[in-house]
Amino acid sequence: MKRLTCFCALAAVAASANLAAVTCYTVPEEYRSGLWEATVDGQANGVASARTCDPPFDKRYDFGGEYAFTAFEMDAPAKVMVRPKAARDMSKVRILPASAPVMLRTLPDGALELSVARPCRFSVEPDGRRHPLLVFANPPERNVPDERDPKVKAFGPGVHLGGEKGRIELKDGETLYLTAGAFVKGGIRAHG
């Protein structure tokens, strides 16, 4: 009986360790990318869309227009699959920085299999700076502030307007905490 109990306990620890290896984030519908989709260890992971300043706003430079980003937490090596939503030439994909702990494999259907060895940040660039995918493979969060603390201004998953008139005011000793999946519209003004 001791042997069976010990085996069951070890199996439970191994299973929970396996489940905790990756935490995927969601992205609200209005921010989802039209360029890319991603999975991490088989789980759907949100991909958000963003823009750089591009013509006609700044006619002197072309900064590349729309890009996308995806983020997740990992505490063990992870397999990330990314796929462009529209047909794209994926034959010259670069991972930058080149020193990122990522192994790239291009699949016949145009999907990319990225073996990420440890938490890091990198970009997937099929054709230079045009419509890249930024990947934020974060370590698990530590020292999370208590959202019930009156000195903590916390925003949970979803879309939020930051404070009055879109401005978040922070005073001396206050902490701003954005949980995974929080999208806050507005600016931050810190005093103290």
Cite the ranges covered by each PLM segment.
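Hydrophobic h-region of N-terminal signal peptides that target proteins for export
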Residues: 5-19
